[in-house]
Amino acid sequence: MKIAVLALQGAFIEHEKKLEQLGATCIELRQKSDLDQDFDGLVLPGGESTVQGKLLKELDMFDDLQKRIQDGLPTLATCAGLILLAKEIENQNQTYFSTIPMMVKRNAYGRQLGSFHTIEEMKGIGKVPMTFIRAPYIESVQEGVDILSKVNDNIIA
């Protein structure tokens, strides 16, 4: 299985290492020509969603990736990636891919000092270690969106 990892900014290396441990082959998406390769899934990593969104547009990668996601490309998104997929971002007019009917709250857990680690239940998987560093959470979802996990009554997956 070949997984493309958005590698413009953020925590892409951590995702690649874990995917390779699980037996996947990873390719990094850094420029438009990288999208010419075949891949079976996509990872949108944590980082800074505003920077990632800006770079995707400047590098002319945005429309192609948005179409692939809309067409059903399996996509894993963490932190900034979650923000990129949201149809609404609390207190912000601009959205990015807008592919999941949900509203997210950026930096919902506060500043760096508000970071924490926990182990919580993930639907269909079991207990999963989770780390939150200036992480978003999901304020609300529309019909058809499955909630996979909550932390302190906040939707996180």
Task: List the model feature ranges, each with a label.
Residues 106-157:
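Amide-donor transfer/coupling interface in amidating biosynthetic enzymes
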Residues 1-58, 63-71:
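N-terminal beta1-alpha1 cap of cysteine-dependent amidohydrolase-like domains
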